[in-house]
């Protein structure tokens, strides 16, 4: 049984041209694709609690990460 497969590296520029099937995770429980957006409320609640605590402990210098991650 051969467990190692040869694969080709894809450049980021080429990868960005692929359309469809992409879901963006914004890191706070919000997810969006081309058709809809939805919220994972347990992830959102955890993010809010974590960021609130870290903001309190660091005097406002931590938490509230924003920005999409594809």
From Swiss-Prot:
Superkingdom of the source species: Bacteria
UniProt entry tagged with the keyword Protease: no
Transmembrane segments: none
One record GO biological process: killing of cells of another organism
Disulfide bond entries: 32-37
Compartments reported by the entry: Secreted
Keywords linked to the UniProt accession: Antibiotic, Antimicrobial, Bacteriocin, Disulfide bond, Secreted, Signal
UniProt cross-references to InterPro entries, sorted A to Z: Bacteriocin_IIa (IPR002633), Bacteriocin_IIa_CS (IPR023384), Bacteriocin_IIa_dom_sf (IPR023388)
GO terms for cellular component: extracellular region
PTM info: The disulfide bond is essential for the activity.
N-terminal signal peptide: 1-21
Entry keyword annotation includes Disulfide bond: yes
Family: Belongs to the bacteriocin class IIA/YGNGV family.
Record's function text: Heat-stable antibiotic with bacteriolytic activity against Listeria spp., E.hirae, E.faecalis ATCC 19433, S.bovis 83, S.uberis 42 and L.lactis.
Listed name of the protein: Bacteriocin ubericin-A
Protein source organism: Streptococcus uberis
């Amino acid at each position: 049984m051969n467990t190692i497969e040869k694969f080709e590296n894809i450049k980021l520029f080429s990868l960005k041209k692929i359309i469809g099937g992409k879901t963006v995770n914004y890191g706070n429980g919000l997810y969006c694709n081309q058709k809809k957006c939805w919220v994972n409320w347990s992830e959102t609640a955890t993010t809010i609690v974590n960021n609130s605590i870290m903001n309190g402990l660091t005097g406002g210098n931590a938490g509230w990460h924003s920005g999409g991650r594809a």
